């Protein structure tokens, strides 16, 4: 067994709970959103960001359940960023398969990226921590400024 698998084993039940929250929170009344969400979720990925959140919670002795939602909204922000980046970069493949924008089009991909961002912020608000909102707002703003500079550099 490789070391990453061993690390995952430490928080395997929590990773399952995060995946359940991700699937439930991606549900929409719009079929196209559900199709794109399934395309994204079924694409796999290592879920490194949620893993780090879960490991940090464990290392700090956290005993609640808020870390599950925190891990999910971190993954949502990452996913939204990837959806938008693939459109900006004109990417057609990620992890060996067609990107959402290649399959569903740029407009749908951007709109679902926006949907995923909005769900992330709903989940953050539900945690009820002003500090979490401040940190994540700053991080998201920083991420946007980095991508804006990268885009301007490409032009």
Task: Please give the residue ranges for each predicted region.
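N-terminal amphipathic/basic leader segments beginning at the initiator methionine
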Residues: 1-24
């Amino acid at each position: 067994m490789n070391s990453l698998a061993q690390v995952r084993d430490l928080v395997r039940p929590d990773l399952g709970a995060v995946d359940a929250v991700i699937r439930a929170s991606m549900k929409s009344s719009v079929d196209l959103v559900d199709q794109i969400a399934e395309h994204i979720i079924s694409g796999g990925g290592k879920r490194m960001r949620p893993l780090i959140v879960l490991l940090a919670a464990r290392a700090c002795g956290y005993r609640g359940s808020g870390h599950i939602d925190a891990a999910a909204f971190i993954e949502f922000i990452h996913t939204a960023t990837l959806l938008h980046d693939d459109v900006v970069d004109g990417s057609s493949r990620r992890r060996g398969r067609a990107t959402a924008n290649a399959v569903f089009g740029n407009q749908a991909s951007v709109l679902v990226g926006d949907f995923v961002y909005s769900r992330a912020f709903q989940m953050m608000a539900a945690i009820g921590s002003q500090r979490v909102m401040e940190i994540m707002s700053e991080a998201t703003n920083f991420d946007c400024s980095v991508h804006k500079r990268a885009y301007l550099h490409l032009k």
